[in-house]
Amino acid sequence: MTDKQRPFGVSMTEREFDECLHADEAAFRSPIPTQMVSNGEYNPLPQTPKQKQVEFLIKEMADKEAKRHNMSRRQFLATSSGMATAFLAMNQVYGKMFEVDEAEAKNLDAAGDRKAKYKGQFIFDDQTHFIRDDFKEEGLLGLTKWAEGAKVNPNIGNIPTTLSRYKMDNYLKEIFMDSDTTVALLSGAPFDDPNWWLLSNDAIQNACRSVNKMAGSVRMLGHSIITPKYPNWMDEVDRAITELKPVSWKSYTIGDPFGPSKYAWRLDDEKLMYPFYEKAIKAGINTICIHKGLMPRDYEKAFAGTWENATVNDVGKAAKDWPQMNFVIYHAALRPWLADKPDMEMAQFEKDGYIQWSTDLARIPEKFGVNNVYAELGSVFASTAVTDPRFCSAFVGQLVNLMGPDRVVWGTDSVWYGSPQWQIEAMRRLEIPDDIMKKQGWKIKLGDGRGTVKNKIFGLNSAKLYKLDAQKIAADVKSFDHDMIAKMKAEYLAMGGERSNAAYGYIAKDGREFEQG
């Protein structure tokens, strides 16, 4: 497999690709993934023994309840009760990590009551993607692997295996029809090869304007991608400020996501970046989102000479020197998570409270005396929640307790992972175990799904970053309930539309055979 056959963001080697399967070739369809899925930027682990237990329990419980409700297993698992069943199975295997009770799984009305509880919750997804209509790189189809191997998709086989999976129509369905997402930030990525740009800066803004005009409300916001060290890169910054007027900037300090790139750079490069910060602040576009962490297992070789640019050792000084600039660190800088075994990562944390690269990020506010550094959860929440929920709770808990609940923002990296609804449900239900709280000396629990901490993470922190008046959010949510997207969603559901549970990525090959649900 050549580099140009590889999907977006993929940094794994040819041998590592040979160890993976397409999700739509190898998976039990579950509301929540039952094994780790990668978007290609890191290596997926084989299904663990505990994940196999979870899958077995989901099947067993779902078969029983589906029969009782005169439904097929697949139909049952597409309901809210099916989602609750998956969380019950996870709690049986991992301990009580998620807030759920048996009534939700057994009683479709009880599951509906929970859904009503969260109606109108403001959820701002700080990292979403789709591709332009004329994108021709078929290698992107490798991302289809996630859903089935992760066991999440009742109907993925009904979606043609074409690039349409990643285009705008399916994006709108997955994000706004099949999840509780209120507002989405549309992102992109730079590549040394211009053919691999997913969306141009113009396309990002045009998409946002089109959707918002159709909706009659602000449902989408957009980045402009910056490319430090590219020839004449500041000319594009000037054009974006004058013509495009993005809400924030996005870039990769490693340069090209395929790496290694001749355009790798640092946030604290005074000659290169400080003139940009000055210009951005003057223009009132003072938030920059930076890909950090999330590297493949062989990052030291694959990104030789540039991998250190994916660490956070350039964040503190830049944030201190530019207090008016907001630095949103995508993937919370988590290194190639679970590069070996899940229990090794958790054992390391239990021993010394350290999570590679992410803890370095969490310590920046206190170490540098800054309050303008944020952690974003795209991809890393999804992969940790389904592989080791206890680790996930420690990971999120550390960010909340060291950085503060005002400095953690929600993101899912969808549409690569399909509908983000299961991630939303997992975050609503997740709590930090008391023994971790006590040992780490933490004071802040995650709390209720609509409590102060989770409401901040889900949307209020990003509302502040992107200049949406937080005091008007409640009123805005009511307007979202009556805009065109809300009307389309109501009609979609009334006609029997249901979440496909599709996701598009990579799973590890571990002897699985395709199962029809």
Show the residue positions of the predicted features.
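Active-site gating loops and adjacent loop-to-helix segments of metal-dependent hydrolytic enzymes
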Residues: P46, Q53, R132-Y166, P260, ...
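Catalytic pocket-lining loop regions of alpha/beta-barrel enzymes
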Residues: L140, F258, Y263-W410, G418, ...
